[in-house]
């Protein structure tokens, strides 16, 4: 695991881990939209992915969702449904396909140990699948959260087919080579109380500026790491709830700009 992604893993571990997400599961179960599990061939492996379709009469853009270090949780599946609610086909690969864990610590350790070539291969396989979805319009973007947010930047540097990248509180690149191949705008969503991650933003801004790339980070004051999930909880504090609402409002505007 790279130094930056390891830093994200540590930051994620400091967030209250995901116990039973009954509130997220209830929202998902009550959704009118179609969601399904699919199997995708990735080399000699088969991975699972969760796909949710929007209710619309025309073809839609597809957003690849890279989950947190907790794995493909009910919250991540619920977020896919919320993307579909906003007209997007969302697909989230389970990067721990074939593994089960009794607690979040087990998932954290397993994800931290995943080989980077395997992660890239699984994301590539999911991207290829996504671009062939009959209801898709050929536009592909990527988003990720925490550990997945760090991978958003990394994967944007690997996949020239991406039209946009949305990184939520993931560490940003620290070397020119890590942004050299980025061919799409990168939008960052960061928590004010998350200096461990935010300290990486200025370097990335300079690297992207030198490379002539678009990078627009926004820091949401008062929020903590993981605010997109924490702010959705029934007992969320006001700072996280407000940051989530503001981030979603911005994200919806950006999603509408996808071709």
Predicted feature residues:
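A conserved short beta-strand
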Residues: 161-171
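Alpha/beta-hydrolase fold nucleophile elbow
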Residues: 134-145
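Short beta-strand/loop motif that positions the catalytic acidic residue
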Residues: 182, 188-190
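Acidic catalytic loop of the alpha/beta-hydrolase fold
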Residues: 193-198
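C-terminal catalytic histidine-bearing segment of alpha/beta-hydrolase fold enzymes
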Residues: 209, 214-259
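Bacterial N-terminal signal peptides
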Residues: 5-16
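Serine-hydrolase catalytic machinery in alpha/beta-hydrolase-like enzymes
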Residues: 24, 28-32, 36-131, 228-233
């Amino acid at each position: 695991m790279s130094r930056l992604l390891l830093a994200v893993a540590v930051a994620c571990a400091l967030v209250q881990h995901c116990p039973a997400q009954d509130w997220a599961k209830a929202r998902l179960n009550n959704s009118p939209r179609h969601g399904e599990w699919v199997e995708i061939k990735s080399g000699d492996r088969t991975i699972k992915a969760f796909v949710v379709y929007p209710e619309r009469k025309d073809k839609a853009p597809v957003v690849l969702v890279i989950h947190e270090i907790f794995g493909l949780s009910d919250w991540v599946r619920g977020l896919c449904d919320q993307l579909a609610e906003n007209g997007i086909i969302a697909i989230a690969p389970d990067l721990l396909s074939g593994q089960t864990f009794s607690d979040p610590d087990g998932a954290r350790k397993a994800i931290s140990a995943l080989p980077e070539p395997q992660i890239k291969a699984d994301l590539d396989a999911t991207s290829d699948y996504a671009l062939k979805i009959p209801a898709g319009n050929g536009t592909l973007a990527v988003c990720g959260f925490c550990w997945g947010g760090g991978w958003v930047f990394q994967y944007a540097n690997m996949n020239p087919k991406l039209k946009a990248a949305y990184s939520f509180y993931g560490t940003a690149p620290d070397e020119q080579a890590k942004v050299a191949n980025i061919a799409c705008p990168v939008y960052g969503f960061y928590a004010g109380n998350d200096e461990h991650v935010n300290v990486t933003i200025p370097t990335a801004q300079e690297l992207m500026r030198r490379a002539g790339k678009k990078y627009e980070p926004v820091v949401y004051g008062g929020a903590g790491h993981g605010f997109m999930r924490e702010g959705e909880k029934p007992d969320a504090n006001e700072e996280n709830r407000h940051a989530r609402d503001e981030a979603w409002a911005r994200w919806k505007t950006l999603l509408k700009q996808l071709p």
